[in-house]
């Protein structure tokens, strides 16, 4: 157990909170990793801690992504900013501007995933990062995908210099290996488990 703690890092990794609100958290990852649901859960956690979060729907490719975010946000009492099928970079910028204007102190950008890491996705995510300069980039990784999770983590970290990882579906026996490998490959902390 102590070896595990040493490997994973003993310090408790928290979200970086901006001194000038809103704090912008960009959620990235492969399709099906659980970005939308777990991003909303994270926003819910921040709400419980007294923050005023806003969810921003930047995934314009998956047909039900915006609706899913609205449903999950609605269940948690968290508003969702969306502009339909617009350009994701414009949506991110408008969402952050809306948050500033309306007094939200946290913004969670739910970005598009793909089945595999591809150039178009990485370019879009890099453009969103450049446009809104997020305080935190969290990579959402499905622990059940094993080596794929490790490869994805490496690719996303190289492109975006992620700040941390949110591991989802960490409920089986062989799932801890993904956590250790992702941490080893990126050197970034596992900040949340969904």
Predicted regions: what is each one?
Residues 29, 57-60, 112, 140-143, ...:
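Conserved residues at beta->alpha junctions
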Residues 1-58, 65-85, 91-111, 124:
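Primarily NTPase-proximal linker/entry elements flanking Walker-type ATP/GTP-binding cores
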Residues 13-15, 58, 113, 119-120, ...:
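Flexible, active-site-adjacent loop/turn segments at secondary-structure boundaries
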Residues 93-96, 104, 116, 123-130, ...:
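Conserved phosphate-handling catalytic cores of large alpha/beta enzymes
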Residues 83-87, 140-143:
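Short beta->alpha junction loops
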Residues 33, 61-63, 88-89, 113-117, ...:
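Short, small-residue-enriched loops and turns at beta-alpha junctions
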């Amino acid at each position: 157990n102590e070896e595990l703690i040493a490997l994973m890092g003993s310090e408790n990794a928290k979200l970086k909170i901006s001194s000038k609100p809103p704090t912008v958290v960009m959620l990235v990852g492969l399709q099906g990793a659980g970005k939308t649901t777990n991003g909303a859960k994270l926003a819910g956690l921040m709400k419980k801690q007294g923050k005023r979060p806003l969810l921003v729907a930047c995934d314009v490719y998956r047909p039900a992504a915006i609706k899913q975010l609205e449903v999950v946000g609605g269940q948690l009492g968290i508003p969702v900013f969306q502009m339909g099928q617009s350009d994701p970079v414009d949506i991110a910028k408008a969402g952050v501007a809306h948050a500033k204007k309306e007094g939200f102190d946290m913004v969670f950008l739910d970005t598009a995933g793909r089945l595999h890491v591809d150039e178009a996705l990485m370019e879009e995510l890099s453009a969103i990062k450049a446009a809104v300069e997020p305080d935190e980039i969290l990579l959402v990784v499905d622990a059940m995908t094993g080596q794929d999770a490790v490869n994805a983590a490496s690719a996303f970290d190289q492109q975006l210099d992620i700040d941390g990882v949110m591991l989802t579906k960490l409920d089986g026996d062989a799932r801890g290996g993904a956590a250790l490998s992702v941490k080893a490959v990126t050197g970034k902390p596992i900040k949340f488990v969904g």
